[in-house]
Curated annotation (Swiss-Prot):
Gene name in the database record: hisE
GO MF entries: ATP binding; phosphoribosyl-ATP diphosphatase activity
Keyword Cytoplasm: yes
Protein name (Swiss-Prot/TrEMBL): Phosphoribosyl-ATP pyrophosphatase
InterPro entries the record matches: HisE (IPR008179), PRib-ATP_PPHydrolase-like (IPR021130)
């Protein structure tokens, strides 16, 4: 089990814990809108760190972004394996071709 898989398992284990003792449980209690807001907030902080911060700040914000994304995915019933399978599917495809297929 790698770090992301362990983190996903930890998030699952804490999802229904007491919101007073678990940040994951607190996020779940607040619902999808709050989780989505946190992903957006962490994405913005990651971009800012990439443009103006140190490598250490970027690493920290990247970790926060991944954590909050995993919380959101799990709340929607989407597993890390599903996301990794999609990345596997896209491997070797031109990014421009992939975007064209999606109509982006």
């Amino acid at each position: 089990m790698n770090t992301l898989q362990r983190l996903e398992a930890t998030i699952a284990a804490r999802r229904n814990a007491d919101p007073d003792s678990s940040y994951v449980a607190r996020l779940n209690a607040k619902g999808l809108p709050k989780m989505a807001e946190k992903v957006g907030e962490e994405a913005t902080e990651t971009v800012i760190a990439a443009l103006t911060g140190s490598d250490e700040e970027l690493v920290g914000e990247g970790a926060d972004l991944i954590f909050h994304l995993l919380v959101l995915l799990q709340a929607r019933g989407v597993s890390l394996d599903q996301v990794l399978a999609e990345l596997d599917r896209r491997e070797g495809l031109s990014g421009l071709d992939e975007k064209a297929k999606r109509g982006d």
